[in-house]
Amino acid sequence: MACVSEAIGLALPYSAGTPAPYTQRDSYALKSGKAVMNLLAKNIRPRDIVTKKSLENAATIVAATGGSTNAALHLPALANEAGIKFDLMDVARIFKKTPYLADLKPGGKYVAKDMWLSLIHI
């Protein structure tokens, strides 16, 4: 689910998946605070950022990583709050067509930290 906040545009790239004990989290916290203040100064709100496309991206990330099926409920709920037409059938369609790319826990072999480490070394 950490990937979801990045996929919908509400977290800085690589920030949400950073493991808790890593010092990079401090840097992301500072950068995130600055980004939020910049967005507020420009009167940009979450509803200006979250779109149907970003929700589709989030569902795709969840499906590709074997992520939480709770996303099938949370993403449509978020869409509803934002006034975006995106429901469980949209999530199901995306889950059905998206290949499974990362064998992550809870059902898989690897933990989210492993994916984060692979991404920061690209």
Regions found by a protein language model. Give the residues of each.
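Accessory "access/gating" subregions that flank catalytic or transport cores
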Residues: C3-G107, V111, L117
